[in-house]
Amino acid sequence: QRQMCIRDRPALVFGVAFGNLLQGVPFELNELSQATYTGSFFALLNPFALLCGVLSLAMLVTHGANWLQMKTTAALRDRARAITQIGALVTLITFVLAGVWLSFKDGYVVTSVIDHFAASAPASGKQVAVEAGAWFKNFNENPALWAFPALVVVGALLNVVASKANRCGFAFLFSVLTMAGVIITAAVSMFPFVMPSSTHPEQSLLMWDATSSQLTLNLMFYLVLVFVTISLLYTTWSYYKMFGRLDESFVEDNKNSLY
C-alpha cells in the first residue's frame, strides 16, 4: 500500500502543477530573461490546484484499471472493473467542477500584436490582460473546439457503460479518448500561453517567446529521432511479449521469460 501511495504521487503532482499554470505562477524575469519564483511552496497547494490533482489522479487510475481489465482474470479483473467505473465517474465530476470553477476565475489574454517571427524576448514586447473567464475565449471564438470537453464527458460515460458490459477493449479505448480530451481541453484553454505570470502578466511565457535557440532545437530533433525510435521499438517488443491475459497458468508457463 505504501508503494502504491508513492507511485500515485506523480499523477497527483501533475494535476496540481497544471492547476497552478491555469491560475498563473508568481515569477518574474530579469533583463537576461532569467526567471525568479516569488511564491511559496504551500501556495501551490491551493484548492483549485488540488482539485486538478484529484482529476489527474482519477484519470490515470481509471486508465490503469482499464488496462488491468484486459490483462487479468477472475477476482482481480472484477476489482479492476469496479475501480474503472468509479474512477471514470470521479474523472467526469472533477472535470466538470474544474471547468465551472475556472469560468469564474481570472485568466490571461494577449492584448497586443505578437510578431511570430521575432526573436524570443519574454521579458518585454507584449501586453497581457487579466480577465475573468478568459480561458474560455478560444472556445467562444471557435465553437468547434467544444468538441474536446464534450469528448471527455462522452468518453467517461461510455467507459462506464463498456466496463459494465464487460467490453474491456472498448472501455480502454474510451479511457484513451477521455484522457486525450482532458489534456487537449487544457491546452486549448491556455493557448498561446505556456506559463502565465500572476505577478507580472506582461512577462508571461508564450509559445513564440519560450522557445530555445536554433542550435538546441536542431540538436534535440536529431536526438529525438534516435531515442524515440529506440523507445518505440522497445515498447512494441514489450507489448508483444505481454500480449494476452495474465493468469496463474500463463505465469507458470512463462516463468522464465516474465521475470
Where are the regions a protein language model picked out?
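Short, membrane-exposed interhelical loops at transmembrane-helix boundaries
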Residues: 125-130, 197-217
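Membrane-interface transmembrane-helix boundary segments in multi-pass integral membrane proteins
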Residues: 82-89, 136-146, 208-226
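Juxtamembrane interface elements at the cytosolic ends of transmembrane helices
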Residues: 18-33, 54-76, 158-159, 234-247
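Short, small-residue-biased leader/transition segments that mark boundaries at the very start
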Residues: 2-6
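Hydrophobic alpha-helical membrane-insertion segments
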Residues: 7-17, 88-108, 173-189
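Loop-centered beta-sheet repeat module
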Residues: 40-91
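Membrane-helix interface motif
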Residues: 18-34, 101-119, 191-200
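Membrane-interface interhelical connector segments
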Residues: 106-141
